[in-house]
Curated annotation (Swiss-Prot):
Gene expressing this chain: ywgA
Organism whose genome encodes this protein: Bacillus subtilis (strain 168)
Protein name (database record): Uncharacterized protein YwgA
């Protein structure tokens, strides 16, 4: 049961801290698309790919005392910070986890904004479409984000960079 949970704990161990639920969702989705062994089911929601399974796993890790969650008020919304607890770290040390090295990937995506990762994950969500059709779809679905052509091109370049890291 805790094998998938342990994989998530490894992400927190490698990152030190992840700020934002949306960012966490996108980091795991992009990792999955980069062939890291994550198996959470994702659907497309308002902020791009979203996994209810991942949300529940994070809640379970918090309830077990393996993950520390801090809720902060930021302007008109709440922001969540996540980090591995000492108990979580001790559990992870004893877990028989067969995971490829993710540290370079985690450092890279965790340094990016959740807005940018939302764009990257949305592009990856529609990776079965032709390039122009994909771009049109992303700009239509994400029209409220007002992404520029430059940001879209940067996201495509970043996806290629991630493929090299992974």
């Amino acid at each position: 049961m805790l094998k998938e949970h342990a994989k998530l704990m490894k992400v927190f161990s490698d990152s030190g801290e992840i700020i934002g639920r949306k960012k966490l969702q996108k980091m795991i989705y992009i990792a999955k698309k980069m062939q890291f062994p994550f198996y959470e089911k994702y659907d497309f929601h308002f902020y791009g790919p979203y996994s209810e399974e991942l949300t529940l796993q994070i809640e379970e890790l918090c309830n077990l005392g393996f993950l520390h969650e801090v809720k902060e008020k930021k302007g008109g919304y709440f922001q969540y910070r996540y980090s591995l607890t000492e108990t979580g770290s001790a559990f992870l040390d004893h877990a028989d986890l067969d995971m490829p090295d993710m540290k370079g990937y985690i450092d890279s995506v965790n340094s990016r904004s959740s807005r940018f990762l939302e764009l990257v994950s949305t592009i990856l969500y529609f990776d079965g479409l032709e390039d122009e059709e994909k771009k049109e779809k992303v700009f239509t679905i994400k029209s409220k984000q007002k992404y520029t052509n430059e940001e879209y091109d940067e996201a495509l370049q970043y996806i290629e960079e991630l493929k090299q890291i992974c």
